[in-house]
Curated annotation (Swiss-Prot):
GO terms for biological process: symbiont entry into host cell; virion attachment to host cell. Glycans are attached at T72, T80, N85, T87, T92, S105, N163, T199, N233, N248, N251, S253. This is Major surface glycoprotein G. Residues 1-37 are cytoplasmic. The gene is G.
Amino acid sequence: MSNHTHHLKFKTGKRAWKPSKYFIVGLSCLYKFNLKSLVQTALSTLAMITLTSLVITAIIYISVGKSKAKPTSKPTIQQTQQPQNHTSPFFTENNYKSTHTSIQSTTLSQLINIDTTRGTTYGHSTDETQSRKIKSQSALPTTRKPPINPSESNPPENHQDHNNSQTLPYEPCSTCEGNLACLSLCQVGPGRAPSRAPTITLKKTPKPKTTKRPIKTTIHHRTSPEAKLQPKNNTAAPQQGILSSPENHTNQSTTQI
């Protein structure tokens, strides 16, 4: 700010000095030629010019100072805020680094815990599978239930065909006591034991067929007006015709069926 004001003062003084310099040179020339009256008038005019120039420079200086007085407050505010701006990123970077390292450490610890828990779960599962395999190998072959298919296209009757043949283990005849089924299936000795166990085929029970009975339909015929007029002509016939009418109707209905 101070440099700028000094520069403006120097420019205004330089502009006022040029005409005054030429004026002084002219006055000196007139003084040599002994023109006192002219010199006095010139000196008076020069004094007036210098006074006016000084007044003009003072006015310019005051106006420039007022116009530049307002922005002078802003640099002071910026200077007070600059140290805060310089120091805040340093602290934020340190905070970011510390938080980043803490997050990484927590994630790594969580991953390690997950891996250990997975290892334990896998260990339990492998032990369970091995125990199941040993149990299945040690157990004797038993009747297996047919698998349940959720689809409706395969009916459950197809599964019974696969399970009709059942394999039985080797049993000696000495264990059978009065059981005819056991005697028919047992072997006398181990030497005669067949390569394959005998199979029992179960016969399917046929389903009872349902026969639909025919439904009887009775048709009632209306008597014609000619039949009603016949009793008037014959005196004995009307009673027979009236009595025989329901029998005739039943005979007609049975014949039509």
